[in-house]
Amino acid sequence: YYQMGKDNANKELSAFDVCAEIGYKPIKGLQLSLGAELMSGTSQTDTANKVNHSFNPLYGTNHRFNGYMDYFYVGNHLNTVGLLDGYLRIHYTYKKVLFGINGHYFKAASDIRDKRKGATDKLSDNNLGGEVDFTMSYNYTDGVSIQGGYSQFFGSTGLQMLRGTSSLTPTSNWAYIMVIIRPGSVKWPKVGLKM
């Protein structure tokens, strides 16, 4: 995707999002996917600041891309340094049960300024951290399923500089469980893990 024109501040916009993924099914029920997504960003060292290179995924993609923890592009996605998300997904389906594990490595697509005291005009490490997402889904019937998961995020100094705080917890986690009900013969939109 390519975005061009003017942003909300009437500044020139030139941004992109590109993704590549390969998948492999070595045995019945097992699916492996390896991929990377690159969303352009605006460098924090760009003092001219004439062109906005920050890609804006106009609508929410909560949990679908860039990890289930939603550290990036949910509520704080405007005028960012961009994102490189390298990921590996492993999904295994057995009868009515799906197990999934996703691993992500996040890196800023543009320069991050080191905001620590005495670090004037220095660049921070562009490493933003990693994330592991574990999920399990049981398809009870065509209209009812249950899904649960656990995610762990491992932050870095680069993420601390990007967020502008040294008090950022190095690790964050969350867990969830949900029941999905799709009553009747209506074709409901698919949510949760793909069976």
Describe the role of every protein-language-model region.
Residues 68-73, 104-107, 112-133, 147, ...:
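Outer membrane beta-barrel transmembrane domains
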Residues 170-195:
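Outer-membrane beta-barrel "beta-signal"
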Residues 29-32, 96-101, 142-148, 185-190:
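Repeated loop/turn-to-beta-strand initiation elements of outer-membrane beta-barrel proteins
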